[in-house]
Curated annotation (Swiss-Prot):
Pfam families: Corona_NS12-7. Belongs to the coronaviruses ns12.7 protein family. This is Non-structural protein of 12.7 kDa. It comes from the Viruses.
Amino acid sequence: MDIWKPETKYLRYTNGFNVSDLEDACFKFNYKFPKVGYCRVPSHAWCRNQGSFCATLTLYGKSKHYDKYFGVITGFTAFANTVEEAVNKLVFLAVDFITWRRQELNVYG
């Protein structure tokens, strides 16, 4: 099987489905505005059994001291049989991570 990962040049971006929930969470907790991309998974790819479509997002943090500096926090990838399912799964995972990270960072001040 070939190694496959979503590439930026093949992605289509969306702000539909539940992406507005993710945008709200990113704005509230000071993350860069999210760009959720999706693409079709090739039939020869190792991850095709996870679903026909892939949604992906890289979460960037924003420094409070340098307004233009963004650092990579983590990346998310979700697979499903439809674009809507993949994007909704990705949004759920990302919002859950953002709220969990906020709670854990508050524990330490």
